[in-house]
Amino acid sequence: DLAAALDDRAPPAARLNTRVRPVPVKTQVGQVAFTVPLRTLTGLRWLTWIAAANNAGSALFDLTWLPTVSWWWVALGWLLLISPPGRMVLTAAGARMLLRPVTPGDYPRGGKIHLRLWLAERLADEMGAANLAGATWMRYYARALGADVGKNVDLHSIPPVTGLLTLGDRCSVEQEVDLRGHWLDGDVLHVGTVEIGLEARIGARSMLAPGARVGARAEIAPGSAVFGDVPEGEAWSGAPARRAGQARGPWELDRPAHRPVWLVAYAAVAGLIAMLPGLAVLAGLAGMAPPFDPPRRLADGGAGGDGRPPPP
């Protein structure tokens, strides 16, 4: 009986992995070559901040030895490379140009489609299109990438660069949900669509695999992994996700009032967050300014510290 019990507790035999072909050398060379222009984008963003700091230092602190450029060039660089809308527009334009031939399906790892997808994701990372400063603009970023976004959608996660995403009206996607819609399995790249239905809710840090479809008013618990279809009005949880009952529905039937003033306020704060590196540069530049000469003490009648009048 003891031997039988121990045998029952033994872990199941794992399936042996198939032989995985390595990434072709030409793809590796291409990735290294594309890294140079990608990193250059980050350098251009910092050059914009440095140019603004040089102009300010030369004008405010009389640091004439600093090289300066026209403020128009600084404004253009800030608009395209630093402001959240500019970064999102450039990223979306580049991603749509790169991923135009990409459709749902299976592709070889290291092939042309994989390289295009890798390049589009690295472009988004280098541009910082989906960082904290752009949280307010996430719905517009998803539309720019080609996603089908319904009305009054609450999107708090990064949309896929492929644009193969459908968000139904009034659905809610919480923070850090994996919506990429693609993954590598050995030497095969799986690319699929992700669909979220009307008023469905996706919990934080969940994953929707390629081809996942969440029905209307369904609920996915936080930390779940969804493979396949979730029927309407059901609650699923776990990894992989399984049916856990009926969806609870919203706490209140009346939706909160949508106030555009808060959207504007959040967008303004996003712009301020994007300016924090520039403020750090200005703080460092202030340390190079000439020392401040305090005025003479009034008690001395404008005289020096020893009571004698200052030299002419």
How would you label these PLM feature ranges?
Residues D1-A3:
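AMP-binding/adenylate-forming catalytic domain of the ANL superfamily
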Residues A142-A144, D148-R243:
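Structural signal for interior beta-strand "rungs" in well-ordered beta-sheet cores
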Residues D7, P12-G146, E232-P312:
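Terminal amphipathic alpha-helical/low-complexity segments used for targeting or macromolecular assembly
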